[in-house]
């Protein structure tokens, strides 16, 4: 119970997990077991099966040495079966590169096919005032379609949708951009700053980035291209997802334009999203690790705020400390 309490209160960030000593009775039972089999005890497998090493040793108390060895054999079998098998597993997902429509999902409509118009943001309502009139857009803002529109309109902020939800275990996040457009809009004076963002900033809706709903990998690459396109005009990209795998292409795109290590990231999340042992490289639990590993953001310029719940555990906090990353648990936030 104390371990769970420490985690829920955020105290695991400040204390190392105590190592459970191996009981002498267990040492006696394994003294004749081959060393290569005992290596499984150093893996996460015992804790995965029984929660803690203390519980594991407790479960072994009534077993004979032969039964203990059989239990270790079972854990080894599970560990081996969990690994990649080149004889039975696919290392990559095959694609039909002969398909004439391979890139049709992200092929742009040539401007020559559109009615000729002067570049710049397009207002989609016929009315001067009122909210929720005309076609729904982010923040009730005018629409921009091409980079030329951003440049001609001297746009400060381009809000763009990224309806991707395949980097998560659950579906539905792809409806985020649609839901945000259906909200009342944005406007009025913020009471904390006495500033009306819609008046002091030129804001546009830049549409949704195309997503291949059959491939997270292809989609994320295209998101990176489109976010980079916005940033190259000098406009600030404001991305509405979508699941959290999108953090990686968003951050990488800014590094493409401004240079690796030239900016920082403030990451508000209950989890640190720096997992590194999962089968898929592009998920909602790994964008921070990839952004740091590939050098897009220096770890000391990554700030985590709001960490709570069961993840990260001791290894995650150790990784952040070793890399100089700053973090603030939700317990700290509530105190302040």
Map each language-model feature to its residues.
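Sec/Tat signal peptide C-region and signal peptidase I cleavage site
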Residues: 11-15
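Bacterial N-terminal signal peptides
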Residues: 2-10
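Conserved alpha-helical scaffold segments that buttress catalytic/binding sites
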Residues: 17-159, 164-336
